[in-house]
């Protein structure tokens, strides 16, 4: 929280694992949360800091800024009474570095050792108010107004007075940015800036889980809004008057769309109740892989909905079912392997359970039709995209695989083109199939990717780019074609299909527009058909898949 100062010099604690005298639970959680029920998120924060090797904790009571004052004012308006005692805001800041001399904390806690911070609001509520009895029976409320930490990583001294960060294996947080925070009192402060995702909690009285999920996305994803989004702003957009309105069942999809429309955001939406045959994980994954956050609405139980922010994914290249499901039941699982099959978790921020938690896709896949049971089922998803992008990548991927299959029907490969021959063989065997991985990219990114690539046969980099590609639209959906073993072992591919990320219109209906593509040794023609000879292409082997550089960083992969 930038520009928000402490009332006094920070309290400094040694919190290193194994150090006598400090417990995250008894010394941090219990005194602040006491009888409050919403402590799952702070437990997650402390567990994350413990695993990342936190050695020093700073605790400060803050001078309230406008946002903090608004939170307390709205709470008082909601309960309709003066709060029994003065509410407070506490900031916790975590460092991987030890602090041997507490008077010199600004010198001894380097920027590279900063793991993250959390601002917690505390308020005592009058227990004779019905809504307080229902929602906060103890009268003691505490919740995270704002937090930002590094994604899960190993943080260690690098020997040069700084700290090195190595991301957790196969753990990708695609949506992140830098968050500046000011630690210390006025005149004796220092600024730190972790790079990660924004986190916050609902308080259940003036804002709910949808507020939290929206704020986590809007305050993290770059290019969506030009200011920090607060709970009061969202309530004002919806015309919520805390003296009259209480969102006891959360916000509706229509209210969420009212907010996105008011902020002039470009979104893609999917209704998995109306279209239960659309696999929600296959719909979400290309957006997340592209760096676009997704708001996911689901039912933990039949009668209750919940909203979370999807910011990344983990990958398990050893998953058994990715190939086995097609091998054993090809009639039930389609004609190709969506790369989403190797996603073993979506990385989500859940205001109930904390930041960077891992939700397995299978948790929200129900075999019962939605009209009979909504329990543990994805209901609705909203992806937040750059302006003008209106083609769902889910459909771009299906169309791209259709083009490859269409080409297979009219073209026999040259006997020397072994990799194209291998693709055709996989396509011809229902129990084998090919892999499709779809993500968004700009034309500039894609051209740079090709020009920097040498294939497994030693061909490349590609110096002559197709004229079609030079004149391509700026925003594209890229579907990469691979084989299961090649994708999981090498993270390599054997071809690309590019689709315009903006839908053309024909008779008022959106249309997918094929731009260009290649497979080993050839360029894929528009509308492959008998008698059409594909143009040659210099790459005949496999090349690395395209990565979004912002999520790679120093990390381990398997």
Can you describe what each PLM-predicted range is?
Residues 174-270:
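Glycine- and small hydrophobic-enriched segments that form the cores of compact globular domains
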Residues 215, 220, 302, 314-316, ...:
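Short loop/turn segments at secondary-structure transitions that flank enzyme active sites
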Residues 1-173, 315-558:
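Noncatalytic regulatory segments and standalone regulatory/sensor domains
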Residues 179-186, 203-204, 306, 329-332, ...:
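Residue-level signal for functionally critical sites in structured catalytic/ligand-binding pockets
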Residues 257-339, 346, 556-558:
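Active-site-adjacent substructure of cysteine-protease-like catalytic cores
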């Amino acid at each position: 929280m930038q520009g928000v100062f402490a009332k006094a010099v920070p309290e400094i604690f040694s919190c290193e694992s194994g150090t006598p005298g400090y417990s995250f639970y008894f010394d941090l959680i219990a005194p602040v949360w006491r009888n409050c029920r919403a402590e799952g998120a702070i437990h997650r924060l402390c567990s994350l800091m413990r695993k990342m090797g936190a050695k020093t904790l700073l605790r400060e009571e803050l001078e309230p800024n406008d946002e903090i004052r608004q939170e307390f004012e709205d709470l008082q308006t909601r309960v309709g009474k003066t709060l029994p005692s003065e509410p407070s805001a506490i900031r916790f800041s975590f460092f991987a570095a030890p602090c041997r001399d507490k008077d010199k904390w600004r010198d001894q806690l380097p920027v590279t050792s900063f793991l993250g911070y959390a601002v917690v609001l505390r308020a005592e509520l009058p227990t004779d108010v019905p809504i307080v009895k229902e929602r906060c029976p103890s009268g003691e409320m505490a919740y995270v107004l704002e937090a930002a930490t590094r994604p899960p990583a190993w943080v260690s001294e690098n020997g040069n007075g700084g700290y090195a960060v190595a991301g957790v294996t196969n753990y990708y947080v695609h949506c992140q940015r830098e968050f500046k925070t000011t630690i210390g009192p006025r005149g004796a402060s220092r600024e730190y800036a972790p790079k990660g995702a924004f986190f916050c909690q609902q308080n259940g009285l003036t804002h709910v889980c949808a507020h939290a999920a929206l704020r986590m996305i809007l305050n993290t994803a770059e290019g969506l809004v030009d200011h920090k989004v607060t709970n009061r702003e969202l309530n004002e957009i919806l015309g919520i008057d805390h003296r009259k309105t209480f969102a006891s069942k959360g916000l509706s999809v229509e209210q969420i769309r009212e907010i996105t429309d008011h902020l002039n955001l470009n979104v893609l939406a999917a209704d998995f109740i109306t279209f239960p045959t659309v696999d929600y994980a296959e719909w979400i994954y290309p957006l997340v892989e592209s760096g676009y956050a997704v708001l996911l609405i689901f039912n933990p139980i039949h009668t209750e909905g919940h909203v979370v922010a999807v910011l990344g994914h983990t990958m398990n290249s050893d998953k058994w079912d990715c190939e086995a499901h097609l091998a054993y039941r090809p009639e039930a699982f389609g004609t190709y392997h969506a790369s989403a099959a190797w996603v073993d978790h979506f990385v989500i921020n859940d205001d109930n359970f904390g930041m960077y938690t891992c939700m397995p896709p299978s948790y929200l896949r129900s075999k019962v039709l939605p009209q009979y049971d909504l329990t543990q089922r994805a209901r609705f998803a909203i992806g937040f995209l750059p302006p003008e992008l209106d083609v769902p990548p889910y459909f771009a991927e299906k169309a791209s695989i259709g083009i490859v299959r269409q080409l297979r029907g009219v073209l026999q490969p040259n006997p020397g083109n072994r990799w194209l021959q291998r693709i055709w063989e996989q396509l011809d065997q229902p129990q084998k199939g090919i892999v499709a991985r779809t993500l968004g990219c700009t034309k500039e990114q894609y051209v740079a990717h090709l020009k920097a690539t040498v294939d497994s046969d030693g061909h490349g980099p590609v110096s002559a780019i197709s004229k079609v590609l030079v004149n391509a639209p700026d925003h594209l959906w890229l579907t990469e074609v691979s084989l299961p073993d090649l994708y999981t072992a090498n993270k390599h591919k054997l071809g690309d299909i590019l689709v315009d990320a903006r839908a053309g219109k024909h008779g008022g209906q959106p249309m997918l527009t094929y731009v260009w593509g290649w497979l080993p040794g050839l360029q894929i023609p528009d509308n492959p058909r008998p008698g059409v000879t594909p143009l040659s292409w210099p790459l005949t082997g496999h090349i690395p898949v395209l990565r979004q550089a912002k999520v790679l960083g120093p990390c381990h992969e398997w």
